[in-house]
């Protein structure tokens, strides 16, 4: 989940999930916010609520996470036709007929990874690469000087990171090691466009390019595929370093055309939309989906908190 700069008419959310039939719209029921145009306040409120719930859950006994031995499969080569499911909270529904599952690096149980592996699914592991989250097990490794402004001014639990910091980068290397050990096929590093926000550090487009390329290089060095999360202003510059993209709300904010730099190279673009109209109005959703398919996007309409309360697929 990424919170875009106030100066831009765009919001995203990554910390904020039956089978798909080709060219059909599928749903699994449930409800979400009644807000049609998903505002920055709506996105931030959902993100904060999910983060606070994760924070409370982390106070209890923490299960030991074991390394998951991958099955003897060929390495994942992302394809533009790959379909996906994205669920970062709640009990993970492993029953979708998709190519890729995008789940939380820290919170997803071993049993879920094992089930997905047994089904031949590809696993992308989500973590925030641009913010400190005070419920994560490695949180205390961040220095005070690494942490900047709050992502949500009303909540202390998550702060922007100084991505120039050697300490921050070492922590991210360790997270990539964890992803490798857990048997993830790829990673989704979130909050990688801090320079468009107010992080509390003099981060620039250049420092962001450097950090994002660092993440991609380190992921690939471990045999992991790596996805570019949002950062729509740097798509062309970063495409060569990344294997796929994850986007929020590019259909709502007319930002999808830039992803042709990925799809033209056969790289998948996994897109999530949160607009109430596309949840509730099948005709409006069909129109949006037709445009998304024409651009070779793999689009889902999902709840803000990514808990699988409902799911509509454009594939």
Where are the language model's segments positioned?
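Hydrophobic helical h-region of N-terminal Sec-dependent signal peptides
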Residues: 17-22
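Bacterial signal peptide processing site
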Residues: 29-32
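Bacterial N-terminal signal peptides that target proteins for export
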Residues: 2-15
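Conserved, well-structured beta-alpha core segment at the onset of a catalytic domain
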Residues: 2, 35, 96
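Post-signal peptide N-terminal segment of mature Sec-exported envelope proteins
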Residues: 36-71
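C-terminal motif of bacterial Sec signal peptides marking the signal peptidase cleavage site
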Residues: 24-27
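Glycan-processing catalytic domains of CAZymes
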Residues: 58-315
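Intrinsically disordered and other compositionally biased segments
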Residues: 6-7, 52, 59, 234
């Amino acid at each position: 989940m990424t919170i875009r700069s106030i100066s831009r008419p765009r919001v995203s959310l990554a910390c904020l999930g039956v089978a798909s039939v080709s060219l059909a719209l599928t749903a699994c029921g449930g409800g979400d916010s009644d807000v049609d145009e998903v505002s920055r306040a709506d996105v931030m409120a959902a993100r904060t609520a999910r983060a606070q719930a994760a924070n409370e859950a982390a106070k209890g006994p923490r299960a030991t996470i074991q390394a998951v031995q991958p099955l003897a499969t060929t390495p994942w080569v992302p394809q533009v036709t790959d379909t996906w499911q994205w669920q970062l909270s709640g009990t993970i529904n492993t029953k979708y007929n998709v190519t890729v599952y995008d789940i939380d690096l820290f919170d997803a149980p071993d049993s879920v990874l094992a089930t997905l592996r047994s089904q031949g699914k590809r696993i992308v592991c989500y973590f925030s690469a641009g913010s400190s989250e005070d419920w994560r097990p490695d949180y205390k490794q961040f220095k005070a000087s690494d942490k900047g402004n709050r992502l949500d001014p009303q909540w202390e639990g998550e702060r922007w990171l100084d991505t120039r910091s050697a300490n921050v980068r070492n922590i991210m290397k360790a997270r990539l090691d964890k992803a490798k050990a857990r048997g993830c096929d790829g990673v989704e590093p979130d909050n990688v466009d801090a320079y468009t926000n107010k992080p509390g550090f003099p981060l620039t487009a250049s420092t962001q390019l450097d950090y994002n390329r660092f993440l991609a290089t380190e992921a690939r060095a471990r045999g992991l595929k790596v996805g570019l999360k949002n950062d729509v202003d740097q798509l062309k510059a970063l495409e060569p370093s990344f294997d796929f993209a994850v986007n929020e709300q590019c259909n709502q904010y007319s930002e999808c055309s830039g992803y042709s730099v990925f799809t033209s190279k056969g790289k998948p673009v996994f897109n999530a939309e949160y607009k109430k109209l596309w949840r509730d109005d099948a005709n409006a959703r069909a129109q949006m989906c037709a445009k998304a398919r024409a651009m070779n996007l793999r689009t889902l309409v999902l709840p803000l908190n990514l808990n699988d309360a409902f799911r509509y697929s454009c594939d």
